Amino acid sequence: MSRYTGPSWKQSRRYGISLTGSGKEIARRNYVPGQHGPNNRSKLSEYGLQLAEKQKLRFTYGLSERQFRNLYVAATKVKEGTVGYNFMTLLEQRLDNVVYRLGLATTRRQARQFVNHGHILVDGKRVDIPSFRVQPGQVISVREKSMKVPAILEAVEATKGRANFVSFDADKLEGTLVRLPERDEINPEINDALIVEFYNKMM
């Protein structure tokens, strides 16, 4: 399954979670898209609930099913911690996500574009792979030639608060993943146990 590239508001309303980070698409119409959206309140089966939770998280990070599943498999091989927590942590360690968490982009989709276009450095070296796994202590910065890109400057100015597990220097346009996040610091609205149950049945 390829990565979804359509309007993010449709998936936001379908799964009841803001994919843009603004929450406006949910506040405006808090029901699924389509002609019968307001009346579409059918009860989901156990499988349906698990699938919906998986899709909700997958669309939040903007990954294809293959990318998402491969990361889940990697999480099952981590010796310490629960699979659910390890999976969420690996998602958070993606370079595009860290760029978003630092406030260098307004959405994860935009962060992925910045990485792909070579605007981002890791420990002073350009990395254009969105899935690059950032380790605590690594410095994420903007390439000197990209420091005046309007979209980056606008994102930094628009960011009002940042997660406790990152630090950011707005003057230098650089930040650090200080530590791995606690579970309650990342997507607390996601029930990762349902996702684990889903993949346990599929694998």
Curated annotation (Swiss-Prot):
It comes from the Bacteria. GO terms for biological process: ribosomal small subunit biogenesis; translation. GO terms for molecular function: rRNA binding; structural constituent of ribosome. Residues 93-156 form the S4 RNA-binding domain. CDD domains: S4 (cd00165). Keywords: Ribonucleoprotein, Ribosomal protein, RNA-binding, rRNA-binding. GO terms for cellular component: small ribosomal subunit. It holds the Pfam family Ribosomal_S4. Part of the 30S ribosomal subunit. Contacts protein S5. The interaction surface between S4 and S5 is involved in control of translational fidelity. PANTHER family: 30S 40S RIBOSOMAL PROTEIN, SMALL RIBOSOMAL SUBUNIT PROTEIN US4M. One of the primary rRNA binding proteins, it binds directly to 16S rRNA where it nucleates assembly of the body of the 30S subunit. With S5 and S12 plays an important role in translational accuracy. Belongs to the universal ribosomal protein uS4 family. This is Small ribosomal subunit protein uS4. It comes from Lactococcus lactis subsp. cremoris (strain MG1363). The gene is rpsD.
